[in-house]
């Protein structure tokens, strides 16, 4: 195993082998403990219909159901949120995940197109033209604004979908989908998340769907693997301590170095990690 590979695995808390049943039990209890300790009553999560939000959503629903049963407090709830920019190409996938697998207590829909377009227009008027890439990040941050607004009105916490295969590459928007109060998938790689979904009886289409951030209008539904330049199977092998090609290892390690800032709080005068 490469020395840096071992450091990354330890930093992200990845185990080479997991028991899906034990992981589900542990992560549901983690969510329950968080809610009881913080005195919050709700969980809020944007649902895209892909593997990560489907898994985080189902774990969240199981957690609030467990708390209601154990405490008799029916205030505990999970709110699944659809956050389309206009008409989303994968809308049917998202609704399938919500209705057929996650089965949340409450479903909300907030279209972020007007807010996003207004922000872009205002920036253009201020003399700062916005690229399609930057507009994609604005979309991600608008979605998080909505989720925190819903959470604030419902004594709720925002659930993040970050996991080890995403964290190692920093493949998320800083203060967008990277912003959350609790990340129940942390430490899992992509294939381990799939194993949890299979244990939970999820339909195959939820974990076989090609992962995509789908933020750029110039490149709609662009696969994550195309943007990253490395396959998730290679990322998972790397995180599980297996040997991967030198090219794949170097690509993963390059992403990890370049995105360190996303895995830290804002840099303070006494911080040294960035130097």
UniProtKB/Swiss-Prot annotation:
InterPro entries: NAD/GMP_synthase, NAD_synthase, NH(3)-dep_NAD(+)_synth, Rossmann-like_a/b/a_fold. GO terms for molecular function: ATP binding; glutaminase activity; metal ion binding; NAD+ synthase (glutamine-hydrolyzing) activity; NAD+ synthase activity. ATP binds at residues 46-53, 161, 190, 212. Pfam families: NAD_synthase (PF02540). Homodimer. Belongs to the NAD synthetase family. This is NH(3)-dependent NAD(+) synthetase. The lineage of its organism: Bacteria, Bacillati, Bacillota, Bacilli, Lactobacillales.
């Amino acid at each position: 195993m490469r020395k840096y590979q071992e450091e990354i695995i330890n930093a992200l808390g990845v185990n080479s082998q997991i028991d899906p049943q034990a992981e589900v039990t542990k992560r549901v209890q983690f969510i329950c403990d968080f809610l009881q300790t913080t005195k919050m009553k709700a969980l809020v999560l944007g649902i895209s219909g892909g593997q990560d939000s489907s898994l985080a959503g189902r774990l969240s629903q199981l957690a609030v159901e467990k708390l209601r049963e154990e405490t008799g407090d029916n205030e505990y709830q999970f709110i699944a949120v659809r956050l389309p920019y206009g008409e989303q190409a994968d809308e049917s996938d998202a609704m399938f995940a919500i209705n057929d697998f996650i089965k949340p207590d409450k479903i909300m829909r907030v279209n972020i197109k007007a807010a996003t377009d207004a922000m872009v227009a205002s920036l253009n008027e201020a003399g700062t033209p916005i690229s399609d890439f930057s507009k994609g990040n604005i979309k991600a941050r608008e979605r998080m604004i909505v989720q925190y607004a819903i959470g604030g009105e419902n004594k709720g916490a925002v659930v993040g979908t970050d996991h080890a295969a995403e964290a190692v590459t920093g493949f998320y928007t800083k203060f967008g989908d990277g912003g959350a109060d609790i990340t129940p998938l942390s430490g899992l790689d992509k294939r381990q998340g799939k194993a949890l979904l299979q244990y939970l009886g999820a339909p195959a289409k939820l974990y076989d769907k090609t992962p995509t951030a789908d933020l750029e209008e110039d490149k709609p539904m662009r696969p994550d693997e195309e943007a990253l330049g490395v396959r998730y199977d290679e990322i998972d092998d790397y995180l599980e301590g297996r040997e991967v090609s030198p090219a794949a290892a170097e690509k993963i390690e390059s992403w990890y170095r370049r995105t360190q800032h996303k895995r830290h709080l804002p840099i303070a005068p006494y911080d040294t990690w960035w130097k």
